[in-house]
């Protein structure tokens, strides 16, 4: 269940970093550092370079986020 105060945006994975962390370029060309959500980790959903993903950003820190969905 999503929280009420998060900002959901779409982006494209441009770099894979250690510990399930990724650099994602948003549709407005900003680059955000993102981690995988717990449900995606639990269900072994893999993310590769170039994948389109949905992110959740908090209003407090717009340069870090959480990947919640990978588009097919």
UniProtKB/Swiss-Prot annotation:
The keyword Cytoplasm applies. Keywords: Cytoplasm, Initiation factor, Protein biosynthesis, RNA-binding, rRNA-binding. It is found in: Cytoplasm. Residues 2-72 form the S1-like domain. SUPFAM superfamilies: Nucleic acid-binding proteins. It holds the Pfam family eIF-1a. It comes from the Bacteria. GO terms for molecular function: ribosome binding; rRNA binding; translation initiation factor activity. Its main location: cytoplasm. Belongs to the IF-1 family. HAMAP family: IF_1 (MF_00075). One of the essential components for the initiation of protein synthesis. Stabilizes the binding of IF-2 and IF-3 on the 30S subunit to which N-formylmethionyl-tRNA(fMet) subsequently binds. Helps modulate mRNA selection, yielding the 30S pre-initiation complex (PIC). Upon addition of the 50S ribosomal subunit IF-1, IF-2 and IF-3 are released leaving the mature 70S translation initiation complex. Component of the 30S ribosomal translation pre-initiation complex which assembles on the 30S ribosome in the order IF-2 and IF-3, IF-1 and N-formylmethionyl-tRNA(fMet); mRNA recruitment can occur at any time during PIC assembly. This is Translation initiation factor IF-1. It comes from Helicobacter pylori (strain ATCC 700392 / 26695) (Campylobacter pylori). The gene is infA.
